[in-house]
Amino acid sequence: MGFTLAIVGRPNVGKSTLFNRLVGRKLALVDDLPGVTRDRRIHDAKLYDLKFQVIDTAGLEEAANDSLEARMRAQTEAAISEADAVLFVIDAKAGITPADSTFAEAVRRSGKPVVLVANKAEARGSEAGMYDAFQLGLGEPCPISAEHGQGMPDLRDAIVELLGEERVFAEERQEEAADEVFTPAAVGALVGDDIEDPDAEEIPAYDATKPLRIAIVGRPNAGKSTLINTMLGEDRLLTGPEAGITRDSISADWEWHGRKIKLFDTAGMRRKARVQEKLEKLSVADSLRAIRFAEVVIIVLDATIPFEKQDLQIADLIIREGRAPVIAFNKWDLIEDRQMVLADLYEKTARLLPQVRGLRAVPISGERGQGIDKLMENVVKTHEIWNRRISTGRLNRWLEGVIAHQPPPAVSGRRLKVKYMTQVKTRPPGFVVSCSRPDAMPQSYVRYLINGLRETFDMPGVPIRLSLRTSDNPFAGRAKKKK
């Protein structure tokens, strides 16, 4: 990606709607309440023939230095300093407010090139707001409707004019574009399109050099953002005593011992009964999307109050989604009798989460940076197991021995016949067993096979899928017709 744009402006002018439009997916929370976005997030974006990175930010707000709003503003100021140019968004329908004027001055002081974006220009009465926008001193406003996708060709042209063609087009694009003429009508579908979807890929064999996607989840205030900030070595995510500070799922790039990592911090996931606000419901849905984007999910538990009902519900959700879980017992620096507490936590992990027997769990202190290398070693090992593939020959040699030792029980006086097994997928490992009467197979025997697979082929701590089907015998039943 050749350049970076920061989308900034006062709260509730449509910054996240524009962000979603450019990246092609609903990655940022959008609601009518001001201050929905609290952290800055970076993602690949596309606007016709322009490919770049875009930063969505918290609304610029005046606030006391020690308040949550002040920390949000600091995040936005950091985004401006990181970007090559700024898309300063105003609400053309509402017109220019004192907050717009104040923070337009802050953007001017940064010295960064600016495109003044007049959003909601499709609304009745927006013309007056458009004219008022000239008083901000940021140049001619570019009218758009981020919600409806109107004005995107004009925005594209404004960005190119601002930064220049040499800056906005990467070298490979310059070679490709030598014989091309840009026409928005011809490529009108290319706003936010063709951004690589992390989950829309063929499942490959395990590759230790491939970037690893990790989501970090847990109850509110378990220390998720503190852990990521420690990993990154910067205050990238908001932290503080207020529960539920993180509302969006925020991604950040990291490298651990040469391995490229994409981290997803998520909103704290509360019990449904406590999710009162519409906004918080949106946040939980956003966290679910982050889990689906991830490969390994680190479940952050507060070691001082672990394994509450909500912790187990989160773990169960991750397992049902087929992701590879790893537990981080955070705030370990607050534990006194560590050896006894750790033994108790391991026992509870095995007892409360038997569906992923052997689940890896590591004590850490996100605030002090203790145990992070050990945690990551377990994350990488779990990811490797999650990608494991076993040959059909090995599976069936094992299955033959299992049946000889413990055959399936007889049902209604008829013994069930198990014929063969094959692995049909990885991520998580999935197997199919061919047998005579799948509907009659007791679930206890299915669990017996899964536990045997886990132990024999060394697959602790990951979900294992096993399904049953009848043998594909085209001549089945013909013998009865013979006379």
From Swiss-Prot:
One of its GO terms (biological process) is ribosome biogenesis. Pfam families: KH_dom-like, MMR_HSR1. Keywords: GTP-binding, Nucleotide-binding, Repeat, Ribosome biogenesis. The keyword Metal-binding does not apply. GTP 1 binds at residues 9-16, 56-60, 119-122. One of its GO terms (molecular function) is GTP binding. Residues 388-472 form the KH-like domain. Signal peptide: none annotated. Gene3D superfamilies: 3.30.300.20, P-loop containing nucleotide triphosphate hydrolases (3.40.50.300). GTP 2 binds at residues 218-225, 265-269, 330-333. Disulfide bonds: none annotated. Residues 3-167, 212-387 form the EngA-type G domain. Belongs to the TRAFAC class TrmE-Era-EngA-EngB-Septin-like GTPase superfamily. EngA (Der) GTPase family. GTPase that plays an essential role in the late steps of ribosome biogenesis. Associates with the 50S ribosomal subunit. This is GTPase Der.
